[in-house]
């Protein structure tokens, strides 16, 4: 533990860029001004937490969030392509209607919101790699 006490925390771009500049300037101008291509500025990139609060409480780890996204995608696929669920006593009458219910719409909205967050992380990863 003595080795950890001697380390200093690396400065992040969040520490370097003033809040007023973050609000007023475009991403391109911030990139040109604060991100160095020659390594002169030694600052780490930071990631803002864009996860909705309700998902953060239920799924505190990234692994749990990705597992949730996978499960909801599979469930949505099952509900979309499997057809209606038949009642065990009456095979002629479907248990679920063909129209989307409120639960399905809520599930789709939550899945799309979480997928948008993951897509932003992946887009940022592609920007940082390029």
From Swiss-Prot:
Its main location: host cell. Associates with TRM1 and TRM3 to form the tripartite terminase complex. InterPro entries: Herpes_TT2 (IPR005208). Keywords: Host nucleus, Viral genome packaging, Viral release from host cell. It is found in: Host nucleus. It comes from the Viruses. Pfam families: Herpes_UL33 (PF03581). Component of the molecular motor that translocates viral genomic DNA in empty capsid during DNA packaging. Forms a tripartite terminase complex together with TRM1 and TRM3 in the host cytoplasm. Once the complex reaches the host nucleus, it interacts with the capsid portal vertex. This portal forms a ring in which genomic DNA is translocated into the capsid. Coiled coil: none annotated. Belongs to the herpesviridae TRM2 protein family. This is Tripartite terminase subunit 2. One of its GO terms (biological process) is viral DNA genome packaging. One of its GO terms (cellular component) is host cell nucleus.
